[in-house]
């Protein structure tokens, strides 16, 4: 499948610092955040004009699920648009607090762990064909996902009883199973719950929940692009070396703690391989595969960055990727800070900086400041991101959903939508079922809109 439907779901961490004596719980802060949403959507679970879903998830975490995208840059742009949507809610909620005499600054973090050790996720969705064995896909994909922190981890300072240590991944310490149908209780690497949001006879949705939330656009593109390409190669019958892991959960933690990528992890049958060995195999197959694949500039950019990052890990010289890979950008920032102020990695100010890197408020968040200074690469523009806040992807089913929502809101009509249904809540209860996520034009939807 060379054209694939993809999406990213991001849960955001919430906290608030108060200026006066009045305090609010995280639940109350989250309700302030969503008050504007509830006022027009009559719910804290809504679909937006850009085709995305916005809702309040378990544990007071706002969650933004991008609309269906069919290109990498489109997906990165819509992922960033989610940050802008949440930032707008943040600014509105702070104003509401001020109007009610509760002075406070609300912080939304696009990260995966809080100070209490709780974890929240960034889930990737990939449409795959129903034909073929799902177990083959998961068997080949699992070693790739366990070791890809080397190329797309967000980085984290982990405080241990002995000392502070810099890790590749925020999420690695919180994953407890390889493949499972649960998402919250056991936190697997691949979630097998079969909800395709499409024609179930043709498709299923691969739900990857092991990834870190990335601030860097190029890291997001590498994370999603490399996984999509590995899936495409599996579907095309490309043969990979068998890197079945003896214990994926132990391996994911070991990989996260080794910035050199050279520490051996145990494979099934007593063999060993390093994260670098495993990633090199997938990368080498990708380079070969591209030679016969239909040209695609975005995929070629992904494979180029993938190779440069593996070279950087191998040589431990990160100069050629230090504006493109989250954990590398973050580690360089910490090292400069430590050198300038003569402090240890365990210093609370470093942990504060770690958190501030993920603050989505422009002008305050550290990543935003790095980006403005040219210390973090761009692959999209502010104008494209702003457009994606209100405009759905024009090449997928999201266009139909977005146009229906816009028309219904402008006509003052009551409606219900989900990923596959568009429904007018009138006497006739007219509903259109959109089972093909690749389809952006549908006469039935046009007629439904025209009838408003």
From Swiss-Prot:
Q: In which pathway does it act?
A: Protein degradation; proteasomal Pup-dependent pathway; Protein modification; protein pupylation
Question: What is one GO biological process annotated to this record?
Answer: protein pupylation
Q: Which UniProt keywords apply?
A: ATP-binding, Ligase, Magnesium, Metal-binding, Nucleotide-binding, Ubl conjugation pathway
Pfam families assigned: Pup_ligase (PF03136)
> What catalytic reaction does the record list?
ATP + [prokaryotic ubiquitin-like protein]-L-glutamate + [protein]-L-lysine = ADP + phosphate + N(6)-([prokaryotic ubiquitin-like protein]-gamma-L-glutamyl)-[protein]-L-lysine
The broad enzyme category this protein falls into is: ligase
Q: Which domain of life is it from?
A: Bacteria
Protein function? Catalyzes the covalent attachment of the prokaryotic ubiquitin-like protein modifier Pup to the proteasomal substrate proteins, thereby targeting them for proteasomal degradation. This tagging system is termed pupylation. The ligation reaction involves the side-chain carboxylate of the C-terminal glutamate of Pup and the side-chain amino group of a substrate lysine.
Q: What else is known?
A: The reaction mechanism probably proceeds via the activation of Pup by phosphorylation of its C-terminal glutamate, which is then subject to nucleophilic attack by the substrate lysine, resulting in an isopeptide bond and the release of phosphate as a good leaving group.
Name assigned to this protein: Pup--protein ligase
The species this protein belongs to is: Mycolicibacterium gilvum (strain PYR-GCK)
